[in-house]
């Protein structure tokens, strides 16, 4: 009943994009033809998903970016997460501090014990029961409703749960997981500058289920149990944005009473999900999965070889960007990925603790 009430009284959705604008040589140029609109969007998003290549670790003379792309150098990756990796003196200072912090976290968590991932039929059923059936479709046309129907069959549920378990253990994802559909939304109504649009990625439903199982549940639980999440993140269960705001006000009041100099900076992490570096992120995941490389490689392969098609007011595009043949493989987590919010918390926890310990 509440669903029907909310659906009736809530604000209408932003319409699908039919035109975009770009600033070319200081002038605003508008595109209204389908091919031009799709090309402008794809060129912008291709740049967004390659921003993480500017991270110093990718340009290191040590070749860490290439060696750890799919955690190919297993020995080096495990040395970093166990704190036994010798960090060269010529490595960029911020990168060196982050690697040391990952090693400190690894010494606390990684124990060489059982790190198997098993997707049980009960967990699979519980996940799909909670989801909204009316979530937008991915490219394959398989959506949440298909899986919500499938969980009513006992054998089908067992097979689908076992499929995710096999994928996590083998590190080999289905080809369909590397095809995505992208929708652009206006952040500000009427403003259609392509760099001001929010990109939402629609992934395969079972890929998002996999991400939820690995990153949102198991990895996040490990991070919480280790008490590693700094209180600044306010990600504890029961905490709200209001709690964080009141805490900031209290902190400023205490600083004023103690006459202690203090600065509060509001910094927007622009394109934060789109520019997450996979080398650093994969090392954090590796720690929190107790060294389970295949489960992480599955996600990395899909995200780095993802081929994105575009959905606009004209329909779905025939052209795409990304894929295996791109000069700079794509990084980032993608909005619409169920692993993105918890992964951002996990990465932020490492960054905040790096600052605290230095």
Identify the role of each PLM range.
Residues 59-62, 98-350:
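Conserved pre-catalytic core of RNA-dependent polymerases
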Residues 1-117, 126:
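Non-catalytic, polymerase-adjacent accessory regions of viral genome-replication enzymes
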Residues 355-358:
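Short, intrinsically disordered, charge-balanced linker/junction segments flanking boundaries
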């Amino acid at each position: 009943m509440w669903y029907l009430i909310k659906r009736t009284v809530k604000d209408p959705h932003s319409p699908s994009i039919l035109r975009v604008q770009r600033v070319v040589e200081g002038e605003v140029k508008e595109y209204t033809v389908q091919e031009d609109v799709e090309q402008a969007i794809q060129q912008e998003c291709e740049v967004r998903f390659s921003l993480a290549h500017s991270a110093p670790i990718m340009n290191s003379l040590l070749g860490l970016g290439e060696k750890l792309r799919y955690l190919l150098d297993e020995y080096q990756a495990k040395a970093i997460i166990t704190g036994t990796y010798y960090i060269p003196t010529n490595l960029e200072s911020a990168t060196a501090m982050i690697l040391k912090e990952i090693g400190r976290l690894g010494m606390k968590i990684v124990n060489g014990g059982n790190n198997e991932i098993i997707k049980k039929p009960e967990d699979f059923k519980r996940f799909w029961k909670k989801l909204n059936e009316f979530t937008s479709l991915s490219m394959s046309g398989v959506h949440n409703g298909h899986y919500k129907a499938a969980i009513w069959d006992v054998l089908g549920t067992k097979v689908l749960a076992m499929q995710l378990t096999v994928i996590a253990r083998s590190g080999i994802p289905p080809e369909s997981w590397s095809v995505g559909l992208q929708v652009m939304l206006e952040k500000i109504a009427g403003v259609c500058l392509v760099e001001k649009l929010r990109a939402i990625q629609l992934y395969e439903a079972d890929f998002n289920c996999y991400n939820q199982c690995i990153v949102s549940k198991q990895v996040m639980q490990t991070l919480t149990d280790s008490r590693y999440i700094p209180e600044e993140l306010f990600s504890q269960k029961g905490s709200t944005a209001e709690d964080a705001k009141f805490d900031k006000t209290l902190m400023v009041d205490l600083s004023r009473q103690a006459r202690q100099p203090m600065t509060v900076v509001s910094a927007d992490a622009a394109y934060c999900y789109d520019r997450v570096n996979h080398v650093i992120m994969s090392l954090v995941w590796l720690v929190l999965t107790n060294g389970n490389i295949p489960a992480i490689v599955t996600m990395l392969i899909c995200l780095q070889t993802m081929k994105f098609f575009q959905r606009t007011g004209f329909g779905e595009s025939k052209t795409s960007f990304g894929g295996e043949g791109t000069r700079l493989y794509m990084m980032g987590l993608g909005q619409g990925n169920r692993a993105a919010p918890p992964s951002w918390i996990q990465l932020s926890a490492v960054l905040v603790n790096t600052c605290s310990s230095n």
